[in-house]
Amino acid sequence: MKILIVGAGIAGPTLAYWLLRSGHEPTLVERAPALREGGYLVDFWGAGFEVAERMGLVPRLMADGYRVREMREVSNSGKRIAHLNPLRVIDGAAAGRFVSIARSDLARATYDSLDGQVETIFGDTVDEITETEDHAAVRFASGAAREFDL
């Protein structure tokens, strides 16, 4: 099946990865002109970590990530009011399957896992979808038109 996925952040390329391995032809469309940079640091563990393991991404995520040893709350004068060791709290509960990573690094790793096998349309977005019995006719904001099965 030819499948259009809107968004090339984290979820879009992850879905494309699994669809490709299931014999489908995914295409990503992303409004931004390139993969987005920046974003917050996210704590990555649980179900997402398990998916990353299955995709073979964990070594890269651990290398790109951060092992935050202490979080502090400080007063206006800089005096420490409270502190927390997230490795002790979260890492213990996650059995070592935990990393803090920049959102853009996580997105880049998932996108790179596609290894150039998925067409990505940057700088465009879906303007209209018309469903028929056997396909979806998609008109992009750029004026381009394509047909997909889903």
Predicted regions and their residues:
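Conserved N-terminal helical subregion
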Residues: 1-3, 49-150
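Conserved N-terminal glycine-rich FAD pyrophosphate-binding loop of Rossmann-like flavoproteins
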Residues: 33-53
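Beta1/beta-strand and adjacent pyrophosphate-binding region of the FAD-binding site
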Residues: 1-11
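Short, hydrophobic alpha-helix immediately C-terminal to the catalytic nucleophile
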Residues: 13, 17, 107-108
